[in-house]
Amino acid sequence: MKFYTISSKYIEYLKEFDDKVPNSEDPTYQNPKAFIGIVLEIQGHKYLAPLTSPKKWHNNVKESSLSCFKLHENGVPENQLGLINLKFMIPIIEAEVSLLDLGNMPNTPYKRMLYKQLQFIRANSDKIASKSDTLRNLVLQGKMQGTCNFSLLEEKYRDFGKEAEDTEEGE
């Protein structure tokens, strides 16, 4: 597994249909916020599941929660590294995602945290895939709420950019 970012235009497009899609940009953010996540293949759709940095409330999240996957340093569970927010995963078009090149990032605590997150994610990729598949199924069956609307987003995401193409063809 690797880390990816996604285009702001694509995020804006999905937000037209589902306001649970996380923001990638907002004028209230003190620093630009990259939408970084991992790509999961779930029943014929590729999804980007976003990461979030560690926050105090993560301590209250149970490991069994399907809405997210807690991250910590391998072998050091006390060193919390954030979450994968599975409840906010979005179906993607590959042309709108870019590989995050960790090698070209300056050596900062943030980069070191990303490497530790990636190591933990790779070691737990089967658990992450299983949890995300279960979550999607429960949401599609109407048995879980507070997530992105996976069925609506799956219906709409492939139409991204088609309006512009249709306009160009009609000229």
From Swiss-Prot:
Reported impact of residue 142 to A: Still confers phiA2 resistance, toxic in E.coli
Effect of inactivating the gene: Loss of resistance to phage phiM1 and phiA2.
Gene Ontology BP term (one): plasmid maintenance
Gene that encodes the chain: toxN
Effect listed in the UniProt record for changing residue 122 to A: Still toxic in E.coli
Oligomeric and partner information: One ToxN monomer binds to a 36-nt-long single repeat of the ToxI RNA; this complex forms a triangular heterohexameric complex with ToxN connected by the ToxI RNA to another toxin molecule. The ToxI repeat forms a pseudoknot which occludes the toxin active site. Interaction of ToxI with ToxN partially inhibits the latter's endoribonuclease activity in vitro. The complex self-assembles in vitro with either full-length or processed single repeats; during the process the precursor is processed.
Effect annotated for changing residue 52 to A: No longer confers phiM1 or phiS61 resistance, not toxic in E.coli
Effect of substituting residue 37 to A: No longer confers phiA2 resistance, not toxic in E.coli
Family, per entry: Belongs to the ToxN/AbiQ toxin family.
Protein's UniProt name: Endoribonuclease ToxN
Keywords: Antiviral defense, Endonuclease, Hydrolase, Nuclease, Plasmid, RNA-binding, Toxin-antitoxin system, Transcription, Transcription regulation
Entries under Gene3D superfamilies matching the protein: 3.10.129.130
One term of GO molecular function: RNA binding
Organism placement in taxonomy: Bacteria, Pseudomonadati, Pseudomonadota, Gammaproteobacteria, Enterobacterales
Coiled coil: none
InterPro entries named among the record's database cross-references: ToxN/AbiQ_toxin (IPR025911), Type_III_TA_endoRNase (IPR053735)
Mutation effect (residue 115 to A): Still confers phiM1 or phiS61 resistance, toxic in E.coli
EC number: 3.1.-.-
Class in the EC hierarchy, top level: hydrolase
Species in which this protein is naturally found: Pectobacterium atrosepticum
Induction section of the entry: Part of the toxIN operon. The operon is repressed by ToxI and ToxN together, but not by ToxI alone (ToxN alone cannot be tested as it is toxic). About 90% of transcripts terminate after toxI, approximately 10% include toxN. Constitutively expressed in P.atrosepticum strain 1043 in the presence and absence of phage phiTE infection (at protein level).
Reported function: Toxic component of a type III toxin-antitoxin (TA) system. An endoribonuclease which is active independently of the ribosome, cleaving between the second and third A of AAA(U/G) sequences, although not all occurrences of this tetranucleotide are cleaved. Digests many mRNA species, including its own transcript and its cognate antitoxin RNA ToxI. ToxI has 5.5 nearly identical 36 nucleotide-long repeats (a single repeat neutralizes the toxin in vivo); a single repeat folds into a pseudoknot which binds the toxin. The TA system protects P.atrosepticum strain 1043 against phage phiM1 and phiA2, E.coli against some but not all coliphages and S.marcescens against some bacteriophages, causing an abortive infection (Abi phenotype). Also protects P.atrosepticum strain 1043 against phage phiTE; phage that escape Abi and grow in this bacterium have evolved a pseudo-ToxI RNA by expanding a pre-existing sequence similar to the bona fide ToxI repeats.
